[in-house]
């Protein structure tokens, strides 16, 4: 449903294509994010074309002729540098991170190497062949097994302390997340998240959220099912830990070369005062109740204003001489 524009309509006269859906395992989440952003853009006065991209996305965009693209895709192809490369080829301004940062952040092993070199604390472990992981414990339990290039906690297994068997599902023919998997020691404690805005004078961390999953693990269902998790904002942590998480998120945003909005996910072991950055999301969820918009609202940036900032940030980069 087309939204009525605001009286001031700051995006009046703009034609913005919103990419939503796509082919990844996070399609459903992207459809919700994209719908919310498209409605906000219409309230801001823009003409909006909603595009659920397929193999012909370049031709569709060329025929649609938007002024810019709002990328609301999540996961494979939309968040890993692929669609960003298409948009660069078409010379279309687009939101969020560019080709290199998107590809780096999606590849957990490469991202960890870059972040560690920049001084960010990341988990140990590494990449293993999935069949080796399925046959025997490659680390002493407890540990975590996850795809090297997926988001939304898709395909993640936690092997608890004292577990007798490894995650045999990883070696099954039905496994579709690549031949190598990331295996890391399990870090006890709190699940924290920090959203960052890549402002012109440097990245700005917004707040720290404590995420409490009803099942004890913040998996896909906990993230997107009603009642699956509780977001405690601000997180009930010492000020020094809050500041450390925010600075670490800003450093990660810069080290990976990210732009626009990102969200860094952490584990905090309060017993040992260990704060570890798990991953950086270059296309964080953008429903009004997602973590990044929640934090923006917490610091005085309502959802529509956050969407406007994302668009204006992309336009500013374009006018400064880059596609995005």
From Swiss-Prot:
Its cofactor is Mg(2+); Mn(2+). It is found in: Cytoplasm. The keyword Nucleotide-binding applies. SUPFAM superfamilies: Glutathione synthetase ATP-binding domain-like (SSF56059), PreATP-grasp domain (SSF52440). The keyword Zinc does not apply. InterPro entries: ATP-grasp, ATP_grasp_subdomain_1, D-Ala_lig_Van_CS, D_ala_D_ala, Dala_Dala_lig_C, Dala_Dala_lig_N, PreATP-grasp_dom_sf. ATP binds at residues 139-193. Keywords: ATP-binding, Cell shape, Cell wall biogenesis/degradation, Cytoplasm, Ligase, Magnesium, Manganese, Metal-binding, Nucleotide-binding, Peptidoglycan synthesis. Signal peptide: none annotated. GO terms for molecular function: ATP binding; D-alanine-D-alanine ligase activity; metal ion binding. Mg(2+) 2 binds at residues 279, 281. Binds 2 magnesium or manganese ions per subunit. Residues 112-312 form the ATP-grasp domain. GO terms for cellular component: cytoplasm. Its EC number is 6.3.2.4. Its main location: cytoplasm. GO terms for biological process: cell wall organization; peptidoglycan biosynthetic process; regulation of cell shape. It catalyses: 2 D-alanine + ATP = D-alanyl-D-alanine + ADP + phosphate + H(+). Mg(2+) 1 binds at residues 265, 279. Pathway: Cell wall biogenesis; peptidoglycan biosynthesis. Belongs to the D-alanine--D-alanine ligase family. Cell wall formation. This is D-alanine--D-alanine ligase. The gene is ddl.
């Amino acid at each position: 449903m087309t939204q009525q524009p605001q009286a001031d309509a700051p995006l009046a006269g703009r034609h913005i294509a919103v990419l939503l859906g796509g082919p990844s395992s996070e399609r459903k989440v992207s459809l919700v994010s994209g719908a919310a952003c498209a409605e906000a853009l219409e309230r801001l006065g823009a003409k909006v074309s909603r595009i659920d991209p397929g193999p012909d996305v370049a031709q569709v965009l060329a025929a649609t002729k938007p002024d810019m693209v709002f990328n609301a895709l999540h996961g494979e192809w939309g968040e890993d540098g692929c669609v960003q490369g298409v948009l660069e080829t078409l010379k279309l301004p687009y939101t969020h991170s560019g080709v290199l940062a998107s590809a780096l952040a999606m590849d957990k092993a490469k991202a960890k190497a870059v972040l560690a070199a920049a001084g960010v604390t990341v988990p140990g472990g590494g990449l293993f062949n999935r069949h080796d992981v399925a046959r025997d414990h490659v680390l002493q339990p407890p540990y975590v097994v996850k795809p090297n290039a997926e988001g939304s906690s898709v395909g993640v297994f936690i092997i608890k302390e004292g577990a007798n068997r490894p995650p045999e599902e990883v070696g099954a023919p039905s496994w579709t997340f690549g031949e190598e998997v990331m295996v890391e020691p399990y870090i006890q404690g709190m699940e924290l998240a920090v959203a960052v805005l890549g402002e012109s004078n440097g990245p700005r961390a917004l707040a720290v959220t404590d995420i409490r999953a009803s099942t004890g693990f913040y998996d896909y269902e906990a993230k997107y099912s009603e009642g699956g998790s509780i977001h405690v904002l601000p997180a009930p942590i010492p000020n020094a830990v809050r500041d450390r998480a925010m600075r670490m998120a800003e450093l990660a945003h810069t080290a990976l070369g990210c732009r626009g909005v990102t969200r860094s996910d952490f584990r905090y072991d309060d017993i040992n005062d260990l704060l570890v950055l798990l991953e950086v999301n270059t296309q964080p969820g953008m429903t009004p109740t997602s973590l990044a918009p929640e934090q923006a609202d917490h610091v005085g940036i309502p959802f529509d204003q956050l969407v406007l900032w994302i668009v204006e940030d992309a336009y500013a980069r374009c006018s400064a001489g880059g596609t995005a």
